[in-house]
Amino acid sequence: MDVAYWNRVAEQYDSEIFSVLAHDENNLIRTRIQKFASETKTASDLGCGIGKFLPILSQNFRHVYAYDIAEKCLEQARENCANLSNVDYVRADLSIREIIMPKVDFILCVNSIIMPSMSKRSRYFTSISNHLNDGGHLLLVVPSFESATYSSIRLIEWNQRRGLSYGAAVMAVWNGNNKQKPSHLQQGIVNIDHVPTKHYLKEELCALFQGLNFDLHEIRKIEYGWKTEFSNPPKWMKEPYPWDWLVTARKRQKK
């Protein structure tokens, strides 16, 4: 998931990258952005991609900064959001080094901290903390490791219903996932279209924010339909549905 990868993906972003905004049918993200909105405050979208969330942020904050690792994604974001006069676009890799960033009151970060490198993820979270004003709010969305495991279990069940033995059903999932590395699974790293992608446990997120200068307000599911996981899922496959984790947290005031 380096710069070259994201610049390459940018050309077919809508078909290659899952749209959380389009599948957030209960508008959980939108309502939280509106909750923290202020015409006097500033916001950032870290990992903005081609700008899906920028119109919402632009409508709800005085000024918005759109950060992304890939210039080609930013080019599309500028084009898609050309009518937004209060957005600045910045190319930056927040996972490799500290950069000078203007402080903001609200940060949106949707499925951006998903690189397999723990050191890069740690630097990214440090960048978030440094970028946010004391008392400011973070809205974070990350893939759920529980959901990924649960989806595999449902796929095994589906394979069995199609006539495979249990062992064969398990191996079909294993082989279909490019024989996932056990060392990756121990870290919550799951292959998505053969790309190692960090997923998070709920308890892992709780522990993570205990170590940061944040008060954790909320961890809840953003649920999606089974079509987001499988092509042509069977009608019998219903709830519980797969999900991402949505986190809201507030940066502590300095004493």
Language-model features: locations:
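A short glycine-rich, Lys/Arg-flanked "PGG" loop and its adjoining helix->strand segment in the class I
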Residues: 122-134
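Acceptor-substrate binding/catalytic loop of class I
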Residues: 116, 189-204
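Core SAM-dependent methyltransferase catalytic element
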Residues: 232-255
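A conserved beta-strand element that flanks and buttresses the S-adenosyl-L-methionine
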Residues: 108
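Conserved class I S-adenosyl-L-methionine
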Residues: 1-38, 139-171
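Conserved S-adenosyl-L-methionine
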Residues: 214-225
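Class I SAM-dependent methyltransferase SAM/SAH-binding core
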Residues: 44, 50-96
